Design a protein with these regions (language model features):
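Acidic/histidine-rich catalytic neighborhood of metal-dependent amide-processing enzymes
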Residues: 1-105
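Active-site-adjacent substrate-binding region
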Residues: 78, 84-196
Length: 196
């Protein structure tokens, strides 16, 4: 989905280079985390290897280059984490009150694309983005960044897909229609967010 997002936004992002003296306030960075799962037993030290490595690296890298009081984490306007996306009929709760405005935009974009007939096999009675809060904490790659104050929009279905962590957690159980619909919603969200 991230590669599809980058491909879909490529022309709009490249068009900014053609505008003289154009310095966009926002840019898009795609980060692929690896090593989320524990090797032995889930703990603070045996999990989230990729994000726990990147977080302090970004915190110690001045941004803009040469800055004394700001680092790459300060430049992160929003971390959008996508996880376990691809099973049919997912529902996404809003995990953090501070991300409600962005979650509400996803909810509104989904409804607008539905009204325009651009979402396949989609029902407003079963929307993907349902604005109810989640009552617990899920340990995932957003945690190191959240602890440092980076705003997070966490998109993981609740409940988790039935095939999660089973031998059936494979390509055969990805739902093409759901993925296509979510790609459209996320692309519209990113175009709006980046003012493109």
């Amino acid at each position: 989905m991230l590669l599809e997002l980058a491909h879909a936004l490529d022309k709009q992002l490249l068009s900014l280079e053609k505008i003289p003296d154009s310095k966009p306030d926002l840019s898009l960075q795609l980060i692929f985390f690896d090593g989320e799962e524990a090797l032995l037993h889930w703990s603070l030290h045996d999990s989230l290897y990729g994000s726990r490595h990147l977080d302090p690296k970004m915190a110690s890298t001045p941004h803009p280059p040469g800055a004394k009081d700001t680092n790459q984490l300060h430049s992160m306007d929003l971390l959008v984490l996508l996880d376990l996306i691809g099973a049919p009929n997912p529902t996404f709760p809003n995990f953090f009150p501070k991300s409600a405005r962005w979650f509400n935009r996803l909810e509104a974009i989904e409804q607008e694309l539905h009204k325009l007939g651009l979402l396949k096999d989609h029902s407003l009675e079963r929307c993907y983005f349902q604005n109810h809060s989640y009552g617990g904490v899920i340990q995932d790659d957003h945690i190191p960044f959240l602890r440092r104050g980076v705003p997070v929009l966490y998109l993981i279905p609740s409940p988790f897909p039935e095939v999660f962590h089973t031998m059936d957690d494979n390509e055969e159980n990805l739902d093409e229609t759901t993925i296509d619909n979510l790609n459209k919603i996320l692309q519209a969200f990113m175009l709006e967010y980046l003012h493109l």
